[in-house]
């Protein structure tokens, strides 16, 4: 986009989920006994809203969300990355208003829009197991976009999970199953050249800590 939009209106990529990625990076460094300021991570925040963050030497260097939380991964109800030309098609061919487009992309797309069932992965997984093809499509698209984003973020980290095995990441199936329902765990196999960790986030803790630090300075 023209640089003028940044200069005059502050149009830029902001990114979101910063407190979550900050917390997860710090806790993962502790788990692996690594100094966070010398460590590189790719953090994936996966909830109804989803984002991936490339963390180099303990600091964010790239994130999948942009000016708004709409950019990036397929999410619960958000579409993630799309062709910007879609906006012209929706307005000229289907007479959509700007508000209708915003509602479509933010509230009616993603896992909900693809599966036409739910924005909740648990419901979609149950339907996929039962043979629902749209539920399976939604899960496949979600996982594909996530794996592609993780692979892309090896570039800013100057390096490169089952789909990423060629990158040196091998999973321990049992450890992967154990690291569910809020449990932290190292899920990479012993022979994996890179480590993969499941780390539950705690955004509230980071916000509370920041608030406490700010009030100390008042």
Regions found by a protein language model. Give the residues of each.
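Oxyanion-binding "anion nests"
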Residues: 91-117, 121-124
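Adenine-nucleotide phosphate-binding core of ATP-dependent small-molecule kinases
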Residues: 110-114, 121-156
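Glycine-rich phosphate-binding loop of actin/hexokinase-like ATP-binding domains
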Residues: 1-93
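Glycine-rich beta-strand-to-loop/alpha-helix junction loops that act as flexible
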Residues: 46-48, 157-162
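Gly-rich Lys/Arg/Thr-decorated short loops/hinges at beta-loop-alpha junctions or inter-strand turns
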Residues: 2-10, 128-134, 191
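Conserved active-site and cofactor/substrate-binding residues in soluble primary-metabolism enzymes
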Residues: 16-19, 23, 50, 81-85, ...
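Conserved phosphate-binding/catalytic loops in two-lobed NTP-binding clefts
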Residues: 161-205
């Amino acid at each position: 986009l023209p640089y003028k939009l940044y200069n005059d209106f502050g149009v830029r990529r902001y990114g979101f989920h910063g407190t979550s990625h900050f917390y997860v990076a710090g806790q993962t460094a502790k788990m692996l006994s690594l100094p966070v300021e010398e460590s590189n991570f790719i953090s994936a925040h996966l909830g109804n809203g989803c984002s991936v963050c490339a963390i180099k030497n303990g600091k964010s260097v790239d994130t999948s969300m942009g000016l708004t939380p709409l950019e990036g991964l397929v999410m619960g109800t958000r579409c993630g990355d799309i062709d910007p030309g879609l906006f012209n098609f929706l307005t000229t061919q289907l007479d959509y208003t700007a508000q209708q487009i915003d509602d479509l992309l933010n509230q009616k797309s993603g896992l909900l829009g693809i599966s036409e069932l739910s924005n909740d992965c648990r419901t979609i997984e149950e339907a996929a197991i039962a043979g629902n093809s749209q539920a399976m499509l939604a899960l496949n698209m979600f996982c594909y976009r996530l794996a592609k984003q993780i692979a892309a973020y090896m570039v800013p980290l100057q390096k490169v999970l089952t789909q990423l095995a060629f990158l040196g990441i091998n999973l321990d199936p049992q450890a992967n199953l154990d690291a569910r329902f809020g449990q932290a765990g190292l899920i990479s196999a012993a022979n994996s050249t890179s480590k993969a960790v499941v780390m539950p986030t705690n955004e509230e803790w980071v916000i509370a800590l920041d608030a406490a630090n700010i009030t100390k300075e008042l």
